[in-house]
């Protein structure tokens, strides 16, 4: 059985997530489950009924906390993938947790960790040895300077430059 992906609770971001998944070339079928999307194969309350026909699922909500909440529900049945556009650059030593979505031309540097259900926007740069918490949304063009630590749920605006080093308490 090949990989089949459900994109859940996506609203308008779902089309972009589908294009990212398609660029990877590893899913034989990609469908939507949503209450407000024309062409969805089912409603949110029916999401469990698509297992085992679909073996992968990912939440694509705009809101980071809801994305994380949905992925936690989905992981009871489904594999939660990391989706990264083939035009992104991810260091082999970077650690991307389940539910991450990496948009085109984003760069994730060596030794960096990207938390669950985090979106790395197009043209965003996460410099080496940074830690990005769960359910963050780094919008297009964000730069996270080396060794930065971003808290759970951080959301940036386009073009933001961040340097938030881990500070030790003495």
What positions do the PLM features span?
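Structural signal for interior beta-strand "rungs" in well-ordered beta-sheet cores
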Residues: 83-170
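Terminal amphipathic alpha-helical/low-complexity segments used for targeting or macromolecular assembly
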Residues: 1-86
